[in-house]
Every structure is written in C-alpha cells, then in structure tokens.
Amino acid sequence: MAMFRNLVASSQHRQHHSHQSLATPSSADSLETQFGCPICLEVYYKPVAIGSCGHTFCGECLQPCLQVSSPLCPLCRMPFDPKKVDKASNVDKQLSSYKAPCRGCSKKVTLAKMRAHISSCPKVQEQMANCPKFVPVLPTSQPIPSNIPNRSTFVCPYCGARNLDQQELVKHCMENHRNDPNKVVCPICSAMPWGDPSYKSANFLQHLLHRHKFSYDTFVDYSIDEEAALQAALALSLSEN
C-alpha cells in the first residue's frame, strides 16, 4: 500500500476548491494534508489540476480517468474536459520549497523528495516489517492465511531496485531499461496466484504497459483464474470512471 498513506489519510476530505492558491502551511500536518494526492494518498508526483473543479492529483494517478469518453473528477465526480487538465506548476514549486519530517527517522525532507526518502528509510522499513498480522474483522470458518504474498511493492527484474510500487516499476523500467534486450520474469504477474515465477516475457516493457495499466489489488478477486480476474478488473475499473 502507499507508504505515505498514514501521513495524508484525511486529504481527500480537506482539499480546497483549487490548490493553485494554497495558503502557507503552518505545520507538518497541514503540509501533509495539502500536498497529499486523494487517489494514491502519497505526496504529489508531477501534479496536475483539473480546470473545471480545480482538484489536484498526481499526473499518473489521473491518467486512467483520461482514457474514457466522459471522464469524471475522482474527488467530486464532476464531468471535466480532458483537454483542460494542466500541470499544477504552483503546487510543484511548493513541493520543492516545503519540508516535513519523515515519520520514521524524523529527518526533515522536502516534499518533492519525500517518496524517495520514505522508500529507502530504514526506520520506515522497520515499521512496515512490524505491522500487525492479518486478523479477520469478524469470526470466520475459513482458514487464516499465514503467508500473504506482497502485491504492493516489487523488485526490478533488470537491476534489482527494490520497494517499487506498480507505477514506480513501470516508470523505472521505461527510464532505465528501455533498450534492455534481456527476457525477464514479470514480478507483478509472478506475485499473483496464477502467476508462473519461471515464465520470462520476451518484451517485458510492452507487457508492463499493456497488461498493468490498473492495480490488481483494487479490483481483483484473487480466488478466480487469471482471465476472469483481468476481465473483472477491466470492467470495474471502467465503471468507476
């Protein structure tokens, strides 16, 4: 799950009509609230703003909404013109100006670098390792899983870079391994119940871009087979837009 989630959990309820006129934050909490993307719940990355309602999101987070014929704002559900989505330059500038303490090591980091810092902070990794074990909300006759696979972060199959979420993995591979001819195992597919950890994709980058445009965790029932899961995920993803 998003590592910045605990910092900005209430952000989707407290965004102003437009982030283009953000007031100067007075505390770390207000920084976290004002600069948290309502979709991924992490600090903004390449923020963009919807012209009609002014709501701001990470550019990559908003992309799926731009692929449908009648897009709706993910926050207020108002229709908007995809041609009137612009880079939130003022927000981007402030991300490089303001600092907030890391919730792991307390080091003050500019918000523009917060994602990278959290992904490599030993204290944060230690906290994540000590997260409570899975416990059902209500009593159940079903067996409690003892080893739930990590489907939140992945390792680059080319260079071994760790702690990459799905979007970060795609971005990392496109920027660093675009011309790598090696056949590699898709770490996202191999984490699925139906995945084959020994199958190597002949064109991994094309596979990433076409097969992993959405997050399986959001839409998929892992008890069904791969094709049914893919079709269900696509249908639900489109219906939410």
Swiss-Prot record:
Region Disordered: start-end pairs? 8-30
Q: For this chain's UniProt record, which GO biological process terms are given?
A: protein polyubiquitination; ubiquitin-dependent protein catabolic process
Under InterPro entries, the record lists: Di19_Zn-bd (IPR008598), RNF_E3_ubiq-protein_ligase (IPR051438), UIM_dom (IPR003903), ZF_C2HC_RNF (IPR034734), Znf_RING (IPR001841), Znf_RING/FYVE/PHD (IPR013083), Znf_RING_CS (IPR017907)
| Primary localization class, coarse | cytoplasm
Endoplasmic reticulum recorded as keyword: no
Q: Where is this protein localized, as stated in its record?
A: Cytoplasm
Primary role: E3 ubiquitin-protein ligase that promotes the ubiquitination of different substrates.
The protein, known as: E3 ubiquitin-protein ligase RNF166
Species of origin: Xenopus laevis
